């Protein structure tokens, strides 16, 4: 069986080189074109899906919609869930990456961005931009909504959704598309492929390119490739 991942298209804050995380920003024209191209690749390669999973952030939802529209599959069920959100970058969200490196040093920022188990500073829950003040998370217990995450914590957040939703869909024979974010997809890939804590630091997923994971009938990893 095959599972297809797509990282959302290039966003407004990708273009501005800002830390994004759980902040809700839109796609750029480049991002829209990336999503259209991804949908056409899937159409040309004959990929059909029974269900699509995405996050509750606009850039991923729009990417999912565009991909499905371009591949003539906009009608299939979509499941939006906060567990597929991008990694929460804490107090770094909204900051310029270059300016942050100048303030804290390249090494410290690299650790915050790439280490598996070290988180950036927390975002104050009272901050107007905190997810605690966003109604799309109002149904969640306060202690579940993050103030900052590393990749390890992101994996712990994503894994229940894999086990409860994505894996059962695959095992039931459904053809699955997951349109999400760089780090939530990296976390899922780490679990599925078996990437080590060290190797995951250098594992990247580019925006808007369909990544196909081939799995056996027990969801063991076989191979991966980009369309």
From Swiss-Prot:
Catalytic activities: (2R)-2-phosphoglycerate = (2R)-3-phosphoglycerate
InterPro entries on file: His_Pase_superF_clade-1, His_PPase_superfam, Phosphogly_mut1
Keywords for the protein's UniProt record, in alphabetical order: Gluconeogenesis, Glycolysis, Isomerase
Pathway it works in: Carbohydrate degradation; glycolysis; pyruvate from D-glyceraldehyde 3-phosphate: step 3/5
Enzyme Commission number, as recorded: 5.4.2.11
SUPFAM superfamilies per UniProt: Phosphoglycerate mutase-like
A molecular function GO annotation: phosphoglycerate mutase activity
Keyword Nucleotide-binding: no
Catalytic residues identified in the record: 8 (tele-phosphohistidine intermediate), 86 (proton donor/acceptor)
Binding site for substrate: 7-14, 20-21, 59, 86-89, 97, 113-114, 182-183
Function: Catalyzes the interconversion of 2-phosphoglycerate and 3-phosphoglycerate.
Self-association and partners: Homodimer.
Protein name per UniProt: 2,3-bisphosphoglycerate-dependent phosphoglycerate mutase
Lineage, highest ranks first: Bacteria, Pseudomonadati, Pseudomonadota, Gammaproteobacteria, Pasteurellales
